């Protein structure tokens, strides 16, 4: 090999090594969290006073992820009680063309989660099963269209963002350690509603090209009536009932989200 060619080869190889050793700086992450009370942090007992009835707090998984990864910007507009229409008509205003990451958790309130829990708490086994079946019919027939509209609105407002949708855990360990409270028939019915939500939400997220985080496995062994609960049972304030507690966000939702997003 002639000296000039040899020198050129050395320079080229050195440049490649330098490029590998000094990768381009990662693009800044501008993160917006959307969703309902599971995303806002209701159930953790710690809330930002300025969030009012939305009950957003620093111990919710979006805030925990932001604290762990230090994105360039972070804003949560998740709100207790939010339905798909609230995301479309209100929360998506927080998105822009500069948004690079969106997490979204919604659908439980559309499906009547609160009424299901109320019916199953105060009604008979058959009342509970009937109400869950009614919810599952809604989830199968109506919720997919609502989710499609919501996901389309998110994509329209944040065309370049990575969007990750999060699901809901099963609520009860069946059979479990609880000697009082709901029957196993009721607990199993409620869990079947969680599975129906998973099926609908994961399918529509995939159809939209969004990521999906299934937290049912993460919460396995940590449901209500397990030996280590990551969800509140009937609690005070009552609105915190049947929501992830601090451990549920820190040890359940956060690792599941990081496994998908990093």
Predicted regions and their residues:
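Structural recognition of the beta-strand scaffold that forms the well-ordered cores
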Residues: 30-35, 39-41, 73-78, 100-105, ...
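Secretory targeting and sorting signals
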Residues: 1-26
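Serine-esterase "nucleophile elbow" of acetyl-processing enzymes
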Residues: 27-78, 93
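A short acidic, glycine-rich active-site loop
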Residues: 50-59, 126-142, 185-195, 239-241
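Short amphipathic alpha-helices and their capping/turn segments at secondary-structure boundaries
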Residues: 20-32, 87-104, 148-162, 257-261
